[in-house]
Amino acid sequence: MTERNQTVISQFLLLGLPIPPEHQHVFYALFLSMYLTTVLGNLIIIILILLDSHLHTPMYLFLSNLSFSDLCFSSVTMPKLLQNMQSQVPSIPYAGCLSQIYFFLFFGDLGNFLLVAMAYDRYVAICFPLHYMSIMSPKLCVSLVVLSWVLTTFHAMLHTLLMARLSFCEDNVIPHFFCDMSALLKLACSDTRVNEVVIFIVVSLFLVLPFALIIMSYVRIVSSILKVPSSQGIYKAFSTCGSHLSVVSLFYGTVIGLYLCPSSNNSTVKETVMSLMYTVVTPMLNPFIYSLRNRDIKGAMERIFCKRKIQLNL
């Protein structure tokens, strides 16, 4: 890469969203309400799982961690976006940009690995129902969660350290609403080939491989379900996977649309819209998907609210 005039970059300017100035207040209110819904919805899921002993099972251990991951993932970008929408100079410090990259990768990958663990849980529940409790032991479940946290820590730290070694020039404008790693690489003055090679290798391991494992799990699940003689049994088996499959489709659908189906026309606008989908919309919808399609969650809400109502009456 040709070296340009280097200078010390203390902050980056985030161009944000392509919203006309006269519509800024409307979109600010919209994004604020979406963020608050995300926080409240995921907090409710976490609290329900903690308080209701009926939900102290492997599936809900993974779900509580996924809700925490979604809550934090949205919190990495949304507060800064909302702040910059009200600011005349939408900037972010250099250190803040690196921190945002780290936590964005960390919580994004954590949700990815937890979806794999949940797919394995559904696979065992449907394909080996008689051995479910012995296979999905507390030790294995905790190990899967800890492994997810360890792997995501390594991945996020690796990319953040590689990004920190780069030099940046006078151009400090990021055409995005957060510190997107690919946008930062385009601003770098120093050689980015190492970063690009590592991104290619790690994406293959941390995105494609988990997706392949989920697909393999569902191939086995569908194969087992089709062997069930009664239509009621088939419906019950599919209903246990419905929520997870919806979340998987939502998460990987936006990621595949963004990274594997590039568009030359309006690529910046497309990237921004797709990024909003998986940073704002998906974390907001996940609690609704699990609460509306899950009898256990709805039952836990009824038990806790009824118990609270009885206590108030006494």
From Swiss-Prot:
One of its GO terms (biological process) is adenylate cyclase-activating G protein-coupled receptor signaling pathway. Keywords: Cell membrane, Disulfide bond, G-protein coupled receptor, Glycoprotein, Membrane, Olfaction, Receptor, Sensory transduction, Transducer, Transmembrane, Transmembrane helix. The keyword Transmembrane applies. Residues 1-29, 82-97, 165-196, 262-271 are extracellular. CDD domains: 7tmA_OR1_7-like. The chain crosses the membrane at residues 30-50, 60-81, 98-118, 144-164, 197-217, 241-261, 272-292. Disulfide bonds join C97-C179. Residues 51-59, 119-143, 218-240, 293-314 are cytoplasmic. Pfam families: 7tm_4. This is Olfactory receptor 1. It comes from Rattus norvegicus (Rat). The gene is Olfr1.
